[in-house]
Amino acid sequence: MDLILLVGIATALLLILITLYFLQSKNAKTETKAAAQPQRGVPQRAQEGVPRRAQIARNQRNRLRQNQNAPAVAAAAAPAAAVDSDDDEAAAAGDENGPRVPQGAVLDEKMGAKKRAKMEAKEQKRLQREQELHDREQRKVKEAKEDAERKQQEDLDAEVERKKAEADRLAKEERERKEHEEYLKMKAAFSIEEEGFEEGDADDKESLLADFIQYIKDNKVVLLEDLATAFKLKTQQAIDRIQELQENGTLTGVIDDRGKFIYVSEAELAAVAKFIKQRGRVSIAELAESSNNLINLTPVAAGESSA
């Protein structure tokens, strides 16, 4: 009985020892695996057991190298930074709490993927702003050039218009000057032609009157200016004299609107009156055609020479 109890107790103790051994082995494996994986949120150098002072010294050396490379990077980015200073300041004001991407610097290989993507996005936005600003400047230059060309063309058109107006004005003045000179010449000629003798001896007057009447009868159609010139009278005096002779029955005829006097003898007037009486009702066209046959407008001298 005692032997069986002792064997049972020994078996139980053995099972307990085996169980404790397996549990201890499992815990050791878990700790080893956890130690092999980097802890999230804890710097890698702290996980590796690097002293904090050594980490600080290494960080200082890294910043010193970045500061030494900063002048070259700034000189390369100076033109774009000078043009885009306002946009960069606004972007810097909006991203005060976030890291900035140094131009030309190589991203740290140990930097997290999220941080790397964020910095690359900022760099892409900066390049896009620079391109937009460059395009804007190009448009401004193009618009300024087009405005200058348009203004130059407008100036040329205005100059052409001004020269044309000046040429028209000079041509008009020259034309008016010539017309005025011709008017003065005609006026002087009329003054000379209209000069005549208003007074004379009685015998001379009668002789001149007879010659005046005979001149009209011989020429049949006389220009009043030529008639006045031939007898050294004024044109109006010649017209007045013809009207006086018509009133007293010495001359018969008509003065047309062209300044001519057409002499018609009494015999010719009688022939026209007889034609109208014979025909009764006569149209103007028929009267004009018959008048050409009934009234002789050929000068006497020309008729005699032809005869």
From Swiss-Prot:
One of its GO terms (molecular function) is ubiquitin-like protein ligase binding. It comes from the Eukaryota. Residues 52-83 have a biased composition (Low complexity). The chain crosses the membrane at residues 3-23. Residues 24-307 are cytoplasmic. Residues 107-175 have a biased composition (Basic and acidic residues). It is found in: Endoplasmic reticulum membrane. GO terms for cellular component: endoplasmic reticulum membrane. The keyword Membrane applies. Keywords: Endoplasmic reticulum, Membrane, Transmembrane, Transmembrane helix, Ubl conjugation pathway. It is a single-pass membrane protein. Residues 31-175 are annotated as: Disordered. Its main location: endoplasmic reticulum. Residues 1-2 are lumenal. The keyword Cytoplasm does not apply. Interacts with Atg9; the interaction is transient. Belongs to the DDRGK1 family. Substrate adapter for ufmylation, the covalent attachment of the ubiquitin-like modifier UFM1 to substrate proteins. Required for ufmylation of Atg9; protects the nervous system during aging, possibly by stabilizing Atg9 and supporting its function. This is DDRGK domain-containing protein 1. It comes from Drosophila virilis (Fruit fly). The lineage of its organism: Eukaryota, Metazoa, Ecdysozoa, Arthropoda, Hexapoda. The gene is Ddrgk1.
